[in-house]
Regions:
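N-terminal strand-loop-strand
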Residues: 1-16, 43-44
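Hydrophobic pocket-lining residues within nucleotide cofactor-binding pockets
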Residues: 21, 79, 103-106
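Structural motif
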Residues: 1, 70-74, 98
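Internal catalytic or translocation cores that form aromatic/hydrophobic pockets or channels
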Residues: 32-33, 49, 53-55, 68-72, ...
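Active-site-adjacent beta-strand/loop module that shapes the phosphate/pyrophosphate-binding cleft
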Residues: 56-86
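Short, solvent-exposed loop/turn segments at secondary-structure junctions
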Residues: 11, 52-59
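The catalytic Nudix box helix
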Residues: 16-50, 75
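Nudix hydrolase/Nudix homology domain
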Residues: 11-14, 84, 88-136
């Protein structure tokens, strides 16, 4: 899996590439734009994998996140053949790198949201959830 590596005043951590949708963009258009900005890749957007609510007041970073409620939609994506991990022209604040991480090594990564580890390792489960709820 390809992850953005970030650093803040507390720690280094990893997140999936992506971000906000601009007015007039479809979800795939927004994801392609965000991936160009963050990981310098023109991705092919595939199936919707997960939907997650994030209500900051319910989680450990409530004070730092300013009482937000976000809806996150996670898609499977394909990268162009020969892609080498690199930051795009407009990386996220705190982004210090882009890295491939084998799924069987996700436990060694400080991944956010943490709950994704389990779900990413069980993508083949025919009973897997799509809507994950308000989880972190």
């Amino acid at each position: 899996i390809l992850l953005q590596i970030k650093r803040d005043v507390l720690s280094q951590y990893a997140v999936l590439p992506g971000g906000g949708q601009h007015k007039g963009e479809t979800l795939p258009e927004a994801l392609r734009r965000e991936c160009l900005e963050e990981i310098n890749a023109d991705v092919e957007v595939g199936d919707l994998l997960f939907v997650r609510d994030y209500i900051s007041d319910h989680h450990e970073f409530a004070e730092a996140n300013g009482h937000v409620h976000e809806l996150e939609l996670l898609f499977a994506c394909s990268l162009p053949e020969g892609y080498q991990p690199q930051a795009g022209e407009d990386p996220d604040p705190g982004q210090i790198g882009v890295s491939w991480v084998p799924l069987d090594q996700l436990d060694a990564v400080n991944l956010y949201p943490r709950v994704l580890r389990y779900y990413l390792l069980h993508l083949d489960d025919p009973q897997r959830l799509i809507y994950l709820g308000d989880v972190n």
